[in-house]
Regions:
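The catalytic Tyr-centered alpha-helix of NAD(P)H-dependent dehydrogenases
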Residues: 137, 149-156, 186, 190-194, ...
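Residues that form or flank phosphate/diphosphate-binding pockets in enzymes
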Residues: 12, 38-39, 64, 188, ...
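C-terminal substrate-binding subdomain of Rossmann-fold SDR/epimerase-dehydratase oxidoreductases
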Residues: 3, 29, 58, 195, ...
């Protein structure tokens, strides 16, 4: 079995690469990643010498490069993690999100059509559903919840999802889609909430929280997500969407306070900043379908997952300290200064 994993040098993609090589030692995993700011080749060092692993530095938007890789590897499956994924960056520069998330997906779809594939899996997000009101905790996103996007990022992911389903209906391409809640865990790029707060707290820097911090997110430990995708690509029904959630709803402010407590840092570091444009209020996923059909349930309680995540960042300071220098530092100053 040969699987092309696009975006495999990023956060969720790299964790998926590790999961698959560990669970299926006979599988060949080919990582296709153009190494944007969020892709880090050092993340993949533990598997670089594995004879069943190959890394290819190319963009999914490069049709010639993608076709060449398909001709060389004859993949059985493609799992597409490659995406621009940070909402704030999509507000600043939407075009790169349209290029990667929509055009890149179309290139992969065409390659799958041209060369044949047993399964194409699109890794998507619950953000395509929009948001839920804070005063309705009984409401959850289901697979048939209408798409109602709020940001250029979520709009680009929704467009890609629709394209994937169109290729299934029009061309009979064997596709599946997963829509997940917010992931956390090792190798998470430090622009996102949890790693940003861990890094800042360790350096006794302000902890910037948008608005009042009341926005609610459902948190999913990345290894649980990888196990869900593993089940979907092997046993999921073709043409179906599966919601993958963690049953760990927390306000952003709760998350930051938990991190302060775990690191023994004062809550006085918390600094409220101007809210994000179009900030979604609440995300909450109902994963009943994937549980009923594939037997998946999230295994990691948030209290345990956040401890493991913090320990990883304490044990791997060099990894994230290298990242938060240079381009990221310029971006951070732009996003949080004078707000």
């Amino acid at each position: 079995m040969t699987i092309i994993v696009t975006g495999g040098a990023g956060f969720i993609g790299s964790n998926f690469v590790f999961h698959m090589l560990n669970k299926y030692p006979d599988y060949r995993i080919v990582c296709l990643d153009c190494l944007t700011y969020a892709g880090n080749l050092s993340t993949l060092e533990p598997v670089m010498d594995n004879p069943n692993f190959r890394f290819v530095k190319e963009s999914i938007t490069d049709r010639d490069a993608v076709y060449k890789l398909f001709e060389e590897e004859h993949p059985d499956m493609v799992v597409n993690f490659a995406a621009e994924s940070h909402v704030d960056r999509s507000i600043e520069n939407p075009q790169v999100f349209l290029d990667t998330n929509i055009i890149g997906t179309s290139v992969l779809m065409d390659a799958c059509r041209k060369y044949g594939i047993k399964r194409y899996h699109q890794v998507s997000t619950d953000e395509v559903y929009g948001d839920l009101p804070l005063d309705r905790p009984d409401l959850f996103f289901h697979e048939d919840t209408p798409i109602h996007t709020s940001s250029p990022y979520s709009s680009s992911k929704a467009a890609a999802d629709l394209l994937v389903l169109a290729y299934y209906r029009t061309y009979g391409l064997p596709v599946t889609i997963s829509r997940c809640s917010n992931n956390y865990g090792p190798y998470h790029f430090p622009e996102k909430l949890i790693p940003l707060m861990i890094a800042n707290a360790l350096n006794d820097k302000p902890l910037p929280v948008y608005g009042t911090g009341e926005n609610v997110r459902d948190w999913l430990y990345v290894e649980d997500h990888c196990k869900a995708i593993d089940l979907i690509i092997h046993n999921g029904r073709v043409g179906e969407v599966y919601n993958v959630g963690g049953h760990n709803e927390k306000t952003n402010l709760e998350i930051v306070k938990i991190i302060c407590k775990e690191l023994n840092k004062p809550e006085s570091l918390i600094t409220f900043v101007g809210d994000r444009k179009g900030h979604d209020m609440r995300y909450a996923i109902d994963p009943t379908k994937i549980h009923n059909e594939l037997g998946w349930l999230p295994e990691t309680k948030f209290e345990d997952g956040i401890k493991k995540t913090i320990k990883w960042y304490l044990d791997n300071r060099e990894w994230w300290e290298t990242i938060i220098s240079g381009e990221y530092q310029n971006y951070y100053e732009k996003m949080y200064a004078n707000r």
